[in-house]
Amino acid sequence: MACPSCCCPGVDGPLFSYADVLAHLDGLGLFHMDMGLGRMESALRALGVTRLPCPVVQVAGTNGKGSTASFLQSLSMAHGFRTGLYTSPHFLSPTERIRMDRRPLPESAWPGLANRALAAEPGLTYFELLTVMTVLAFQDAEPDLLIFEAGLGGRHDATTALPADLVCFTPIGLDHQAVLGPDIAAIAADKADAMRPGMF
């Protein structure tokens, strides 16, 4: 259900359709970055998210994040676990990013999730909005395991704001040096900051 426009300041009225959500995302800019966890933490706090309903794995690194995350989902499903997967970027449709047991999140679910996320924190970036929508979708899906692929680095990535139990690192190389640092050591240090107290 869409929220009233007054509950989403900064958004021109409620989002009634999947097309409305895509238009809002396009307005945010796919490649716009505003690094920091503040907006994510604000949204999660407003939504009362302190834990997710099952174990959570975050996959960070430079190369092979998406394939590693997909492999973990396949392995989990082979053992009979209901598994949610969040990856980026998408190839054809943003629905590819949010999957439960390999099934993309239906377009019909997007407006309600987007409105709830924006009501909690209107200033979310493209990636942050999709991340919060994913959290809300997975909360409602009764999963056994959730897997989140980090978008960029680890220290300030939106997925690092989520409560997680395990972080997996894929091979680390030179990428996004203007943001993450000039060399492998700096980039590895940024990604290593995805680790939180109590994680495996």
Residue ranges of model-derived segments:
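Short aromatic/hydrophobic contact patches that present stacked aromatics
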Residues: 58, 97, 200
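Internal gly/pro-rich beta-alpha loop/helix module
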Residues: 165-166, 178-200
